[in-house]
Design a protein with these regions (language model features):
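ATP-dependent adenylation/pyrophosphate-handling site
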Residues: 37-48, 52-90
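Metal-dependent de-N-acetylase/amidase catalytic core
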Residues: 2-44, 65, 87-90, 97, ...
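Generic hydrophobic, amphipathic alpha-helix propensity
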Residues: 75, 95-99
Length: 266
């Protein structure tokens, strides 16, 4: 029973909460669709697929407007549910190739993507090295905007990357970039603190004209969205979870101040 609640019932509850809570959250959102496309950006993704789930339409909209977009994928995704017929090294290669394919569908070239290849789930163990590599990229690219996973997400890599993005902003006071966080594993009420929710400056970018291609880019992550090896115990992201990223808009939290901290890990 406990296993059922953890694997099935509670995720379904969170997905239902997203259906109800998302409109309430977005009722006070600022539509930045007309403002953001022309601005260059750096997208920081904790794992292969986060860039597409969280920012796919925004990336396409920027590229269509002629803006420069770079994507950095921080970890190798090795600890996502892995088919037993694949070794860890083979699975890492699959995930990286899927990222290249998905980003190509979004319109990015291979040169636009950087893989840092830190071990999935262990980004916090390499915080200083990750920060230094990201700082070098920021100094080289100097993007007008930075997009990163939400500091409220229920995954340590997502939070560490968000914390690093905030640290980097403080290290570059003379060359500031607007910082936006995109929620992935956000709809878990155990993570929410009223103060944090009230402090969120919520922004949206509409997906008009880009939703079909975003769906194709998500589908390129076959190891994540399908039981692509056909194994009996194969796992895939839940359809209810994926639907959150194929609605009318993409959701972002603009970081005005780095004061908000990560909630306790679950």
């Amino acid at each position: 029973m406990r296993n059922f609640l953890r694997r099935r019932a509670y995720p379904a509850f969170c997905e239902s909460l997203a259906v109800v809570g998302r409109p309430l959250l977005l009722s006070r959102a600022v539509d930045v669709t007309s403002q953001t496309p022309a601005r260059s950006c750096l997208v920081l993704a904790p794992h292969p697929d986060d860039e597409t789930l969280g920012c796919g339409a925004t990336i396409m909209r920027k590229l269509a407007a002629g803006a420069s977009v770079r994507v950095v994928i921080a970890t190798d995704g090795r600890h996502s549910p892995r088919p037993s017929m694949l070794s860890i090294d083979a699975f890492v290669k699959v995930r990286e190739e899927e990222a290249r394919r998905a980003c190509a569908i979004l319109g990015l070239s291979a040169e636009d993507i950087t893989f840092l290849r830190f071990e999935d789930g262990r980004l916090g163990d390499h915080r200083r090295l990750a920060r230094d590599r990201l700082l070098d990229l920021l100094e080289t690219i100097n993007p007008e905007e930075v997009f990163v996973s939400s500091i409220i997400d229920n995954h340590p890599d997502h939070r560490v990357l968000a914390e690093l993005a905030r640290e980097l902003g403080q290290l570059r006071p003379d060359r500031p970039s607007r910082l936006y966080e995109y929620p992935i594993w956000f709809w878990d009420p155990r993570l929410w603190r009223v103060r944090d929710l009230l402090e969120l400056r919520i922004c949206i970018v509409r997906m008009d004209g880009f939703r079909v291609r975003k769906r194709k880019a998500i589908a390129a992550y076959r190891s994540q969205v399908t039981n692509f090896t056909g194994e009996r115990d194969g796992a895939a992201l839940r359809r209810g979870f994926l639907r959150q990223f194929l609605g009318p808009e993409e959701t972002f939290f603009e970081v005005i101040s780095p004061r908000m901290k990560s909630p306790p890990y679950l």
